[in-house]
Amino acid sequence: MLRYCLHRLLIGLGMLLALTILIFVLLQLTPGDPIDAYINPNVAMTQAEMDALRAQLGLDRPLPVQYLAWLGQAVQGNLGHSLQRFNETVSGLIASRIGPTLLLMAAGLAIAIVIGVTTGIISAVRRNSFPDYSFSVLALLGISSPAFLTALLGLYVFSVRLKWAPSGGMLTPATDFSIPDLLRHLALPALVLSIGHAALIMRYMRSSMLETLNQDYVRTARAKGVREFWVVVKHTLRNAMLPVVTLIGSTIGLAVGGAIFIESVFNWPGMGLLLINAVETRDYPVIMGATLVIGACVIIVNILTDLAYAVIDPRIKVT
C-alpha cells in the first residue's frame, strides 16, 4: 500500500509540474505585456522607467529562467505577490478563498451523491416503472444542461422571481455571521452545482445496480428467503458502489470547472471568482498560484479515490 501511494504521488507531482508548465506557456502566448498590470494608466511612464520596472520584476529574463525562479519559490510556499493587490501575497489570497470553494463543492457533491445514489437505486429496483422513467428523463436533462445556464436559470427563478434565496454573496452584508444566514446563501449555488453530478451518478448507479442484481449470489440470497430490502442493502449496494466511487472521484475536476461559473454568477467569494478576476486583470502570479492549488487538490482526490477501492471491496489489491 505504501509503495502504491508513493508511486501515485510521484505521478501526481509529474502531472502537477506539467500543468504549471502548460499554464505558464499559455500565459506567455496571450496578447499584451504583463508590465501593463503594474502601470497606472493615468500616470505617464518613460520607456526607461518601464524597462527598470521590468528588470525589477524579473520579466526581462529568459522565459525558462522566469519559470524556474517561480517554481523554486513555489516549492518553498512563496507564490509571489498579486499584481493588482500590491500589499497581498498570492498565498494569502488563496488561503482566504479556498475555504468558501471547498464548502460549496462539499455541499454540492454531498447533495449530488445523496440524490444520485438514492434515485439510481430506486430506478434499478423498480425498473421500467414510472419512477424509473421519470428519474431517467430528469437525469438526461441534468446531464444536457450547461452549468452556467442552470446557474442563471436558478438565479432568475428562485432569487429574482420567487424571492426564496439571496441573489448572491456568502453572507448578508452588514450583519453578524450566523449559520442560518450562511446556509441560505449556500443552498441555491450548491443545489445548482449538484444537478449535473447527481444526474451522472444516478445513471451510473442504476446501471451498476442492474448488473449486480443479476449476479448469482443475489439470486441465491433471494432463493434463501432474504427480504428484498436486505438483498439490496447487504448484498448488492456495496458492490454496485465501485464504479460510482470512480465517477465521484472524477467529478471533482468537473466540479471545479462548474464552481468557477457558479461562483461568478452568484458572486460567491471563492477560488473560481478569484481566478476569473485574475484572468480579467492579467494577474499572472494569482493565475499560476490558483491553478497550482486547484490542480493539487484534484490530484490528491484522485489518489484518495483509488485507495477507497480497497476499503469498499477488500478483494481489490493496489500494487
Curated annotation (Swiss-Prot):
GO BP terms: peptide transport; protein transport; transmembrane transport
Highest taxon, organism lineage: Bacteria
InterPro entries: BPD_transp_1_N, MetI-like, MetI-like_sf
Location of the ABC transmembrane type-1 domain: 98-305
Entry GO CC: plasma membrane
Record-annotated membrane-spanning stretches: 9-29, 102-122, 138-158, 182-202, 242-262, 284-304
Record's keyword terms, sorted: Cell inner membrane, Cell membrane, Membrane, Peptide transport, Protein transport, Transmembrane, Transmembrane helix, Transport
Keyword Membrane tagged: yes
Compartment list: Cell inner membrane
Membrane topology recorded in Swiss-Prot or TrEMBL: Multi-pass membrane protein
Main location: membrane
Role: Probably part of an ABC transporter complex that could be involved in peptide import. Probably responsible for the translocation of the substrate across the membrane.
Family affiliation: Belongs to the binding-protein-dependent transport system permease family.
Complex and partners: The complex is composed of two ATP-binding proteins (BOV_A0347 and BOV_A0348), two transmembrane proteins (BOV_A0350 and BOV_A0351) and a solute-binding protein (BOV_A0352).
PANTHER family per UniProt: DIPEPTIDE TRANSPORT SYSTEM PERMEASE PROTEIN DPPB-RELATED (PTHR43163:SF6)
Record-given protein name: Putative peptide permease protein BOV_A0351
Organism: Brucella ovis (strain ATCC 25840 / 63/290 / NCTC 10512)
